[in-house]
A protein has these predicted regions:
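Conserved, structured core segments of small domains
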Residues: 1-141
Length: 141
């Protein structure tokens, strides 16, 4: 099972404040553990929303772009991981070991399971499955 681990933004990450060397060292060590355990597929930190944009698609077909920053930090992300684990419980166990909290003293991490091809059932036709497998092969290099 694959999970996306979402590190929620706070006022410090949204202000562009960088973690200190101690936290970066701890996070690097934790990432090494994830990699050695075969758990980490990928992950990145994100710039503040002030450097981003949102694209809204309306029912009428219109497209509206809103540049950041965005006010509701509880809805924003500061980073993410993609992990391959056996269960949600295993993902939770790993999340409990994340070097936290960040600068603000509190942190929130969300765990979301990623859809796999089999999750789509009958709508995943052989043609769609072949397309998906081909795309994944190209992405894997």
């Amino acid at each position: 099972m694959r999970f996306m681990i979402l590190l929620k933004a706070d006022k410090h990450s949204e202000a562009g404040e960088m973690p200190d060397e101690t936290l970066l060292t701890a996070m690097g060590k934790f990432n090494d553990e994830l990699i050695q355990a075969g758990v980490m597929v990928g992950g990145e930190g994100l710039h503040p929303s002030s450097r981003g944009a949102r694209v809204h698609f309306g029912k009428d077909g219109g497209v509206r772009v809103t540049d950041g920053p965005f006010a509701e930090t509880k809805e924003l992300l500061a980073g993410f991981w993609i992990w391959q684990v056996k269960s949600k419980e295993e993902a939770i166990a790993w999340v409990k070991r994340v070097p936290m909290p960040m600068l603000g003293g509190e942190a929130e991490i969300e765990i979301r399971q990623i859809f796999e091809m089999d999750d789509f059932g009958e709508v995943m036709t052989p043609e769609l499955r072949e397309q998906e497998e081909r795309q994944r092969a190209v992405l894997a290099g």
